[in-house]
Every structure is written in C-alpha cells, then in structure tokens.
Amino acid sequence: MATLDMRDGHAETGATGAVQTQAFDVVVIGGGPAGMAAALTAHKAGARVAIVEREQHLGGILRQCIHPGFGLSHFKQELTGPEYAQRFIDQVRATDIALFLNSMVLGIDSGEGVGASMSVSGTTAGHTVTLMCRDSMLQLTGRTVVLAMGCRERTRSEIKIPGSRPAGVFTAGLAQRYINIENLKPGSRAVILGSGDIGLIMARRCTLEGISVEGVYELMPYANGLRRNVKNCLDDFGIPLHLSTTVTRVIGRDRVEAVEVSQVDEHLAPIPGTERTVPCDTLLLSVGLIPENELSVAAGVELDPRTRGAVVDQSLQTVVPGIFACGNVLHVHDLADNVTTESERAGAAAAAYALGDGAETNAVADTSCELTVSPAGIAGYALPGRITAVALTKLNFRVRRPVDTARVRILANGEEMFAGKVRAFKPSVMESFPLPAKVIQRALDLGASEIVLSVDPVEEA
C-alpha cells in the first residue's frame, strides 16, 4: 500500500513548480465507509485504485460515532463506528491501494484534453482529479472517478433561526466531535432541535457526559430518527420529545442563555401565544443533512433536487460517463451497512468500466433502454433516477410522512405494472423495492419514457 500523507510532505514533485501526475484506473474521492468499500471492491476486480481523503485518517464520520449499532447486517455482529471503520481500514492497508491523505480535491476535469493520456489498464484516461496538498499540487488521472464525499449538516443560518448570535450554538455532529474526539464539553445545559438520529444519539451522549438535556424539539408531528434510537436514547434516559415544536429565538449576548420555543400548526408555522422560554447554555441542531456535491456540480454532474445527490443509473453512474456516486453524497442513508452495500456496487461498476468490461455490469448503457424514474404519491424520491439496462433493479425511496397502510406501485404510461404488499412506512427508514427486468421491458414495449414509483395510502376496511 502506498500512503502519501501530505501533512508530512511525503509526496515529491519533479522539477520545481511542476505538477506531479499519477495514473490510476479508479480514483475514489472520500475515505469514509463509502469510499473504502468502493475502493476495496474495485481493487478486488483488478483495478489500480487511489483514495483521496482530506482528513489525516481514513474512516470518515465513523471515527466519532463511538456508539454501537454498526455491522449488524454486513458483519452479523454489533460494532461501534470506529470498530466498523477499522475493519475496512485494515483491509485497505493490506492492499496496494494508494492513499492520498490530508489532500483536498480542487476539481475534476473531464475535458477532451485529458483523453490523450492512458490509464494503467491501457484504456483512455477520461478524468483528471487535481489535489492541493501542504507542499504541492498533484494530478491523478483515471478512467473512472467514484464520488464518496459524504454529507454535511444544515446550520443555523440555513434554517434561519431568529435572535442574537452568541456562543453555544452547535450542529449535533460538531458537538459529537468535540466530546468523542477532542474531549471537550460543549456546555452544561442543552436543548436539541431536531429528532434526526444524530440528535437523538447526542441527547444520550450529552446525558452520559453530565450535560443536562432539557428536551428534544421536533418541527414535525413525528420523530425523524429510527424508532430504536427514540427508545434507546430518549425513553430510556427520561429525555422529553416535544413534537410539532420548534426554536423560534436564540437568547443571549456572549453565551446562549435560553431559547424560545413555539408550537407549530399544520403548515409548520409558529402558533402565536404558544411561546415559552427554556433556559440553557447550549443549542444543538440536528436539522438535516446535505450531500456534499460542490465537486460534482463543477464536474458537470446533474443533481436530483429531491435528494440533492447525483442522478444515477442502475450501476450508480452519473450523467457524466465514468463518474460514479455512492453513499451519503448520493442520498442520505440510515445505516452504514447500507452505505457499504451500495458502495461495493459502485466500486464494481467503476472497475468494470475502467477495465473495459462495462457492458457486463450495466456500466455501459443499453442505447435501446432509456427510462427516467420519478416518485409519486407520498414517495419523496426514487433512486436510481435513470434506467439504462433491462435488468433486475432495486429502487430506493423514502416517504414524506408516516403511514400505517400503504402500497408501492410501479406505473408506466398510467398503467400499473407491479405492486407490493400493504404495509407501514416511515420517513426515517430508507426503503427498497424490486423492479424486475420483465417490468422494465414491458414499459419499453409500451413506448414509455418514464417509470413511476408511487407510494399510495390505503384506506383500512
């Protein structure tokens, strides 16, 4: 394994001022669970692989997720986040995958000028990834690029909470890093806005660290985290969950002194007269995650406005040939195990494309098959957004609101092609639904250009 830790300046450039160029079959951007899974799968397929990671260590967000609950699907045992990550780190370090740590990607160039170079396998290198390191710049050329940059948290400015701007307002993930990695206590008395999984987990973590959690406040009339986290993190510790309630003002000059909370109506607007003040010195925000796709957009990748991730086909290839996406940069997942499974698919497809075997893994589109996939009913999104091959496909989706009885239906030209069983759905759970090859072929035979995944509530008898 070649490790280039740019913090220590281990990478050497040639002549002074020259930009060193290295060639790979697959360049993976991101060294978290998605990036490592994609890289390992591509390496096993025979591709020469590089991982670029802006942090000093591999592992991504899992390094600070010291709670259990990882690995139940992939390893059939319960692990903490660092334990789960370390299993992949050990596998990566046992290979010759090149690691570029402490390196920031500046851009991905897919221009024609790159096409003259050759990848390690002998095929034309279609992309150049430019890195900024401490002492130099590097360029990595590759036939394929896998985007695995993960996601970031929404901040106070993005949800526009009124009030003063004192110290003591953190995103939940930042507070998690302070406590679990930096050994810093963010405050003594906390209010948590948002019932996403990280907010629920931090309610428990703060309690264990001696921080009094006054309550978790959720804008929606239901919890946005997994049910097991509501039970394990709130119910078991006696932490109250206030639904249909939000923070409407931050109070304090130098440090947070209190927050004002208000109940909201069915339109999510604060109800006048329901305001009350909750004394605290810390406000943690768990108000959503955003796929980190600035590099993707600059490279010409089309984004889905519903997921804010890339539009991909069954092989997880974006609209830019040779660029694939996986993990939370594609759509936000509930479980790291699911990230791993999806990213292994992306790594296999990227390697097949780079090594010239794309047709065997649907990495090369069938020109006779081009269908878009759209959500309907209470489905918030459907992924992949494109069908480019007649093959069994797994569609991922989330619903916009919880429902006790609903059915998934696949439609084409207004005709029902396939339907699932009636069951319950929750927004906190990413769902999957099979799309058989025969259904895709039938849609094509009907002359359809779109397949619709509709989740429709069913009235109980």
Go through the PLM ranges and name each one.
Residues 9-19, 151-191, 195-200, 306-314:
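Glycine-rich dinucleotide-binding loop and its adjacent helix/turn
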Residues 22-24, 135-144, 271-281:
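Core beta-strand elements of the Rossmann-like FAD/NAD(P) dinucleotide-binding domain
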Residues 6, 86-131, 207-294, 391-424:
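A Rossmann-like FAD-binding core segment of flavoenzymes
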Residues 326-373:
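A conserved FAD-binding loop/helix module that cradles the flavin
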Residues 359-403:
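Surface beta-strand/loop "capping" patches
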Residues 24-87, 91, 95, 186-230:
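Beta1-alpha1 glycine-rich phosphate/pyrophosphate-binding loop at the start
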Residues 1-25, 432:
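Extreme N-terminal leader/targeting segments of oxidoreductases
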Residues 14, 147, 169-179, 282-333:
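FAD-site-proximal beta/loop scaffold in flavoenzymes
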